[in-house]
């Protein structure tokens, strides 16, 4: 191993960089395909006893998205709370009627804009603010926001509905931003761990969506008071966020996690020695960077361009279809009046089925990682998912203003298509996300994880924006 003078290094809060006049050669980087499966002889890698680290990352994945999912799932609650703005008394002029009519649009803006801004902010904070501070601060703010929303559930807001709307949108914006910082920070941290831990975090996010869909179905079946069910939703989120704080504080106490969270030795990639995938994140030499506090964005973008395209396009197609198109596909036997074809059709065939299929696709990557990060099959499969757009459009989407043809005359088709949409999204997006931090020098793993989540956010924003146009064309 090459010896480097301390004078050649620049230290930051999370990583150690050395100024270099030229970037590292491709064959000198720790590429995923060439990584060894065992640690160097001088280090003994602890075992993940009882899969404790895996379970913690899985739980953090749930906690990162469960509050947001519950926030969005409580549609009936928002209608109940905001209906006073849109239902004036007899003889009165409608006041602020757009609050209820366009509430979901306001919610989407309050969700996406802060997410993109906070992703960029988090990249700049990677080496300025310790990850422990970022994670705990974001979790604490998320918990505080949900405590406020939980308290307001049983408060009569009929006399100040407009103020309640303002508070709700503000809380959603803060929640979305802090959730983004939390998720991208933890995902960046898993870049220094073996891939199964990144997979656990991503699968946990899908489990959060599945749990919220199940909760929504239970609420429909029980038909309880809307405020009671929402109170149960929000209290569950409060408890889980508090649990996530405890789990994150527990993480460094596990030998296995501590092994990967602490740098062990300064090193340079020499081309003759490759650090194994299962070795801890070392204090390494980074490609040239003029600011030791800011990770070099250029090399990260260069190495992750292909994977970034896959992530953006995968989530673009997914958010183009789900939920805007999926939720408007009706059962062909809707006229029968059965609960399956009316009350439960969309919650079952759209939300629960998609989230469960997405979870299954993500979980499969724990055992199978094909195709690889350099394979042309990965972007090819991402592009192939474009076929889902016409498949869903020609199901029984209603109402139809321009395209009146319904080709798929059975309820089996939307069930099949939604399952394939979720499976392909879960499997392919997880592969692309977990590959990213593994194809760059190890000291850039955390920053690369943040960039990968930015790709995901960009795809979601583009898809959501274009879904409105697609709905208009139908």
From Swiss-Prot:
Segments on the Cytoplasmic face: 1-53, 127-134, 183-201, 252-305, 358-376, 436-453
Molecular function as annotated in GO: cytidine transmembrane transporter activity; guanine transmembrane transporter activity; monoamine transmembrane transporter activity; neurotransmitter transmembrane transporter activity; nucleobase transmembrane transporter activity; nucleoside transmembrane transporter activity; organic cation transmembrane transporter activity; uracil transmembrane transporter activity
Catalytic activity: adenosine(in) = adenosine(out); guanosine(in) = guanosine(out); inosine(in) = inosine(out); uridine(out) = uridine(in)
Phosphoprotein among keywords: yes
Residues bearing the modification Phosphoserine: 21, 23
Protein's GO biological process: adenosine transport; cytidine transport; dopamine transport; guanine transmembrane transport; inosine transport; norepinephrine transport; nucleobase transport; nucleoside transmembrane transport
Membrane topology: Multi-pass membrane protein
Pfam families xref list: Nucleoside_tran
Motif Dileucine internalization motif in this chain: 31-32
Region (Disordered) residue spans: 272-294
Family, similarity comment: Belongs to the SLC29A/ENT transporter (TC 2.A.57) family.
Functional description taken from the UniProt entry: Uniporter that mediates the facilitative transport of nucleoside across lysosomal and mitochondrial membranes. Functions as a non-electrogenic Na(+)-independent transporter. Substrate transport is pH-dependent and enhanced under acidic condition, probably reflecting the location of the transporter in acidic intracellular compartments. Proton is not a cotransporting ion but most likely change the ionization state of the transporter which dictates transport-permissible/impermissible conformation for nucleoside translocation.
Protein known as: Equilibrative nucleoside transporter 3
Taxonomic lineage: Eukaryota, Metazoa, Chordata, Craniata, Vertebrata
Gene: SLC29A3
């Amino acid at each position: 191993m090459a010896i480097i003078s301390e004078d050649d290094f620049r230290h930051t809060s999370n990583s150690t960089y050395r100024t270099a006049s030229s970037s590292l050669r491709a064959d000198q980087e720790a590429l995923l395909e060439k990584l060894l499966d065992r640690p160097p002889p001088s280090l003994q890698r602890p075992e993940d006893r009882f899969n404790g680290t895996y379970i913690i990352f899985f739980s953090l994945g749930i906690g990162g998205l469960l509050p947001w999912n519950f926030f969005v799932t409580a549609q009936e609650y928002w209608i109940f709370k905001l209906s006073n703005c849109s239902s004036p008394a007899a003889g009165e002029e409608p006041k602020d009627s757009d609050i209820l009519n366009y509430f979901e649009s306001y919610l989407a803006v309050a969700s996406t804009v802060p997410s993109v801004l906070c992703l960029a902010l988090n990249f700049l904070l990677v080496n300025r603010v310790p990850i422990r501070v970022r994670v705990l601060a974001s979790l604490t703010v998320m918990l505080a926001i949900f405590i406020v929303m939980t308290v307001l559930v049983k408060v009569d807001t009929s006399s100040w509905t407009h103020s309640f709307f303002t508070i709700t949108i503000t809380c959603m914006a803060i929640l979305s931003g802090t959730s983004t910082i939390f998720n991208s920070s933890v995902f960046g941290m898993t870049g220094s761990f073996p891939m199964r831990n990144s997979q656990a975090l991503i699968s946990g996010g899908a489990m959060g969506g599945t749990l919220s869909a199940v909760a929504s179905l239970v609420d429909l079946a029980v038909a309880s008071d809307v405020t009671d069910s929402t109170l149960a939703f929000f209290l569950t989120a409060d408890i889980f966020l508090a649990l996530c704080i405890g789990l994150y504080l527990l993480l460094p106490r596990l030998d296995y996690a501590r092994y990967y969270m602490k740098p062990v030795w300064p090193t340079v990639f020499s081309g003759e020695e490759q650090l194994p995938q299962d070795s801890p994140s070392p204090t390494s030499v980074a490609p040239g960077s003029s600011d030791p506090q800011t990770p070099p964005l250029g090399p990260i973008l260069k190495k992750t361009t292909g994977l970034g395209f896959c992530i953006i396009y995968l989530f673009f197609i997914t958010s183009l279809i789900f939920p805007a198109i999926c939720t408007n596909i009706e059962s062909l036997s809707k006229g029968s009046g059965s609960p399956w074809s009316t009350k439960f059709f969309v919650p079952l065939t759209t939300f629960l089925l998609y989230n469960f299929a997405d979870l299954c696709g993500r979980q499969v990557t724990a055992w199978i990682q094909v195709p690889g990060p350099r394979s042309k099959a990965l972007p090819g499969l991402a592009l192939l998912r474009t076929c889902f757009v016409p498949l869903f459009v020609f199901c029984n989407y209603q109402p139809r203003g321009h395209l009146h043809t319904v080709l798929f005359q059975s309820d089996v088709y939307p069930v099949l298509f939604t399952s394939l949409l979720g499976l392909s999204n879960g499997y392919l997006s997880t592969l692309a996300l977990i590959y990213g931090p593994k194809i760059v020098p190890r000291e850039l793993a955390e920053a690369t994880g943040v960039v990968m989540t930015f790709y995901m956010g960009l795809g979601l924003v583009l898809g959501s924006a274009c879904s409105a146009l697609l709905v208009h064309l139908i």
